[in-house]
Amino acid sequence: MKSLQKGFTLIELMIVVAIIGILAAFAIPAYNDYIARTQVSEGVSLADGLKIRIADNLQDGDCTTKGDASTGEVGNEDKGKYALATIEGTPAANLSELKAEEKNGCLVKIEYGKGTSGGSVSALINNTELVLAQLANGSYVKESATVKDKFLPKALKETK
């Protein structure tokens, strides 16, 4: 009577381990890129929240507010978990004459690694920045960046 084989041979187990290792070699860098992209997106969301403040400030003739954040007034920055977004710039002299796609002079500087979580930001974007220029219609275009383009949202990659 023949005995039946029970379990796996050593070579079969080694092949499975090799396949898992190859898959992990591709999956881990892709996952790290995904994490960096989501953290960059948080900074862009912070910039979107500053649009209203910029519009209010422009009513007073400046991009930034003179308010004192320590007294409860809304300041020129917004801090998220991974990034700090700050309003900067000087409004264009002919603000009322600008076309919708022209820059109004106001900038939002997003600094990654300066959020509330501090060191938990991805190493791929830590200590980098993204500067967005606001258009007259309120939307943003990329002005400059030390963040790699592959981490930027698609809408920002297609501009400038």
Swiss-Prot record:
* Membrane-topology descriptor: Single-pass membrane protein
| Chief site of localization | other
**SUPFAM superfamilies linked:** Pili subunits (SSF54523)
Q: Which residues carry this modification: N-methylphenylalanine?
A: 8
Q: List the disulfide bonds.
A: 63-106
According to the UniProt entry, where is the signal peptide? none
- Where does the chain cross the membrane? 8-28
Q: Where in the cell is it found?
A: Fimbrium; Membrane
Q: Name one GO biological process term.
A: cell adhesion
**NCBIfam families per UniProt:** IV_pilin_GFxxxE (TIGR02532)
Q: What does this protein do?
A: Major component of the type IV fimbriae that plays an essential role in twitching motility, natural transformation, and protease secretion.
Q: How does it assemble?
A: The pili are polar flexible filaments of about 5.4 nanometers diameter and 2.5 micrometers average length; they consist of only a single polypeptide chain arranged in a helical configuration of five subunits per turn in the assembled pilus.
State the protein's name.
Type IV major fimbrial protein FimA
Q: Which organism is it from?
A: Dichelobacter nodosus
Tell me the lineage of the source organism. Bacteria, Pseudomonadati, Pseudomonadota, Gammaproteobacteria, Cardiobacteriales
